[in-house]
Amino acid sequence: MRKKVLSLILLWAALLALALIYTDRDEYTWRYEGDELAQIVIPREEADARQKQADEAMALTQQAAQARTDAGLWGSENEWEDDFLPTQGENGGLNLMWGDYQATIEYEDAARMDAHVVSAGYQAFIENGDAHDEAEAENVLLHRLSFVFRLTDSTPNLYLASENSEAIRAVTVHKVGAGVLSADLCAYAALVGAVLTALLVLSWDQTERGRKNRRDMAVVLCAAAFACMPLLWRGVYDGHDLFFHLNRIEGIANGLRNGQFPVRIHSSTLLGYGYAAPEFYPELFLYIPALLRNLGVSLCACVRVFEACIHLATAVSCYLCVRGMMNSRRVAVGASVLYTLCIYRLVNVYTRATLGESLAMVFFPVVMLGLYEVLRRDEKKWPLLALGMTGVCMSHLLSTMFCVLFCAIAALASAGKLLARKRRILAVLAAAGVTALCALWFFVPMMQYTADGISTSVVLNSSEYVHRPGSFLVGFAGDVKADAPEDFAYTIGVVPGLALLIGCALLLARRYAAGRAEMKTENDRLALGLLALGALALLLSTDFFPWRTLCSIRKPFSTFFMQIQFPWRFVGMAVPMLSAAAAWGYLREEKDAKTGMAALIALCVVFSGYTMQTMVQRAPELEKETYTDTRIGQFEYTYPCTEKTALKVGDVRTSQPGVCSVLSYEKRGTELTATVQLEGEAAYIELPLLYYPGYRAEIDGQAQTVARGTNNMVRVYGLSSGESGTVHVWYQPPTAWLIAQAASALGALLLAASLRRMRRRA
C-alpha cells in the first residue's frame, strides 16, 4: 500500500514540477519604452478630452436608444463589433480583464511625477488608479514610481495619463501574482493528473476483471482524448454561443468573489449592470470553470479544461450505462466511441459552443439506463432515472423537455408492463418527485420572474431549421461558419454521422438476414427498440414532421413549437439510442467482434477527425490574455425595452439632470454604495444596475422604495434636495427562493441516500 501511495505522490509532484518549470516568468507582463510609450502614456489633457468625447457619444447613443424604444423598435441594435480584443490594442492601450495590476513608471528627474490609470467611458471600474511621487534623490538617472491598481470589471482602452508624460522613459504593467506558478498550467496538470490517477488505480487490480477494465478504459479515454483535438491548438475557437457562455462563467465567478451563493445575478455582465441569466438558464455545472477562474486560471484555460471534462464524462457515462443495459463490455466500448465522436456532439461543443446541450448529453445515457431499469427490469433502480433527469435539468431546459417527451413515449410502449406491475409506476413517480425536488431551487425563481414580465426566450420559426432526410448522409463537415438556417443544417454536419448510421444499417441487415427466430435475445429486442426510438427522434428533426403547420397556427399554441428554435436538436436525443443500437449492429457476433470494432473505430476517427480539422482552420478568438466584453446581445432575461447599447458605466442620474454630484462610489457585485450631493430638487436617483425583483435600498440607513427606472435601471426614492446622502443598494433573494434552496438540498441528500442504498443492495 505504501508503494501505491508513494506512486501517486510522485505522479502529482512531477506534474507540479512541470508546471513550475514551464511557467512563463513574464506572463501577464507588458513593457513599453522608447517609441512604444506613445501606446500607453498620454497627457492628462488628452485623457480628459477622451472622457468628454466618450460621454458625448454615450449621450447621443442613449437618445437614439430612447427614440427606438418610443418608435417600438426596441432591441434592433444590440450588437457590438468586438466581443474579443487582444490585450494590446492595435491603436494603443491595454484591454485587461478584472484583477489587481502593478504599474511601474521609470522617469527622469522631475520635481513631481503623477500617474493616473484612465479608460474613457470605463473609469468607474478602476480603483486606486492615481499615484504621485516626489523625487527625493538627486543625480539619479531614473526614478521609479510603482503602485497597484484594481479593475473591478473587464476594462478596455486603458492608458496611463500624466501631467509630466514627457519625463517618462519606461512603463511596465504586470498582473499581481503572475509569473510564479502558472494557474493555467496547474489546471491542465490537474486534469491530466486526475486521468492518470484513475489509470494508475485501475492498474493495481491484477485480476482478469482488472485487466478488462484497463483495456476498456484505455479505448474509452483514447476516444475522449481524440475528441479534445481542437483544444490542443493555441486557443478556443469562436462558436455560436461561446460569448454568451463566457459571460455566464465570468458572472458566476464575479458573484462568488463578492459573496453570492448561489449566484442569482451575474453582476459583471452588461458593464456591471447585472443580468438574471441564472433564473432562466441552469448553470450548476458552470460553477466548475467559475471556481477555476477565481483561482487565477485564464478564461481560455477554463473553457479548455471544462470542455475536456465534458468529453471525458460523456465517454465514461456512455460506457458505464450501455454496459449496465446490455451486460457487454465490447458493445459498451463501441457505443462510447460512437457517442463520443459523433459529429453532432462535436459540432455542439465546438461550432455551436452550446455548453448546456453538451452537458445534457453527458446525462442522456444515464436517463436511458434508468428508464430501461424502471420500465423493463428492476424498478428499484429508479434513483438512476432521477440522477439522469436531474443532471439534464441542471444543464439545459429544452433537453429536459425532450427527455420527458421520450420517457413518455417509452412508457406508452411499455404500458403493459407498467400496468401489470404497479410498483413500476410508483418508481417512475419517485424518480419524478426527487428530480422535481432537486430542481426546485431553479424553477421557483424562473416561474416568479417569468410571471413578473421578464422576457424569457428567443422565439424563432422552427420550420426554417429542419433537415431534409438526405442531409443525414453528410459524412463530412463543410462550411464551419455557415449561419443561414439551411446552410448550417446541411454543410456544418449537424447529423448523427455515417459511422453511427452504418452500424444501424448493419443491425437492420442482421435482423433481416437472421429472421425473427434468430433475434429474440433481450439485447436484440433492446437494440431494435432503441433504433426505433432513435429513428423517431431523427424524424422529428426533419420536414416529415409538420413544423411549418404547427409554427403557423394561432398564438399561443404556436409559441411552444417556435421556442424549440432548432428542430435538429432532436438529433441529440437520437444519438445515444442510435449509438447503443449501432454498437450492437457492429459487435453482436463475438466471432466478428475484432473486425467490427476496428471498422467502428476507423470510421469514427476518419469522419470526426476530418470534421474537427475543418473547425481549426481559422484563427482562435479566445487566447490566454484575450479581453472579453461583457455586453451580450441576447434580448432575453431582461424587462422589455431594455436598450443594452444605452448602458453607461457608473451612470448615476436623477429626475432632474445636472443637480447630482457623486462624492464617492463603490460597487461590489450586486451591492452598490454611493454618496451623493443634491444641488436642487430631484424625485429619485437612478443607479447603474438593471432592475430585477429583489433589490433593496437604504439612504443613510433608512429603507427606501425601489422601482424600475429609465431603461429599466434601479430607481431609488427618498433623497431630499440640497442634502448629501449615502445610498446603499443590494440584492436580496426572496424568502420563497431560500425555502426552495433548502428543499433542493434535501432532495439532493435524498437522491444520494437512494443511490447509496441501491448500490448496497446490488
Predicted region positions:
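Extended, low-complexity, turn-rich repeat/linker tracts enriched in Gly/Pro/Ser/Thr and Asp/Glu
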Residues: E108-S119, N164-A167, P693-G694
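Extracellular carbohydrate recognition and processing domains
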Residues: G34-Q53, T69-G72, N78, F84-P86, ...
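Membrane-embedded transmembrane-helix bundle of lipid-linked glycan/lipid transferases
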Residues: R2-E27, A178-P620, V729-A762
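Short beta-strand-plus-loop segments that form exposed binding edges in beta-rich domains
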Residues: L158-E166, P733
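Membrane-interface segments at or immediately adjacent to transmembrane helices
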Residues: D35-A64, D70, W74-G75, Q617-E671
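Extracellular beta-strand elements of beta-rich domains used
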Residues: V171-V173, V727
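Beta-strand-rich ligand-recognition modules
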Residues: P86-D100, R112, A120, N128-T155, ...
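Active-site-proximal, structured, solvent-exposed surfaces of multi-pass membrane proteins
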Residues: L647-A762
